Amino acid sequence: MKSIFLVFFAVCLVKAEAGKGRKREPNIINPPCRECYVQDSSGNCVYDKWGCGGARKREPNIINPPCRECYVQDSSGNCVYDKWGCGGARKREPNIINPPCRECYVQDSSGNCVYDKWGCGGARKREPNIINPPCRECYVQDSSGNCVYDKWGCGGARK
């Protein structure tokens, strides 16, 4: 009886060890990819089989687009913000936030959002991966890198 118990225990231990997989930390907001996807060097969301269980799981049907909520995949495969899919005309335009930067970012003289290490704990914390764009909700980054208010993405009414 003891030998059967020991064999059973050993088999359970081996299965438990085999079940442990290499877990990667989830993506920070950049890239805006869904779970199990990572952003490649060209900015596209690609399936990461190792981050999703490796050889233990079958690769699921590809989610097209593999972008987070409020993002859609453009023709080149990049995830871009979809202002209509995220509120459209359903919300009133809120008061303008100045500066329109996320927490730990400040607006510099040219209007760009830059990381403020002192406002976020100074030398006690490492500078996080840059959030691209580092703009608050209802703001988008224009071609020059400035955060500008996006009334359509925040529910502005059609005129």
Swiss-Prot record:
Q: Write the signal peptide boundaries.
A: 1-18
Q: Which domain of life is it from?
A: Eukaryota
| Disulfide-linked positions | 33-45, 36-52, 67-79, 70-86, 101-113, 104-120, 135-147, 138-154
Q: Name one GO cellular component term.
A: nematocyst
| Residue numbers covered by the propeptide annotation in the UniProt entry | 19-26, 59-60, 93-94, 127-128
Q: Where in the cell is it found?
A: Secreted; Nematocyst
Chief subcellular location equals: secreted
Q: What is its biological role?
A: Inhibits ion channels.
Entry protein name: U-actitoxin-Avd13b
Q: Which organism is it from?
A: Anemonia viridis
Read off the lineage from the record.
Eukaryota, Metazoa, Cnidaria, Anthozoa, Hexacorallia
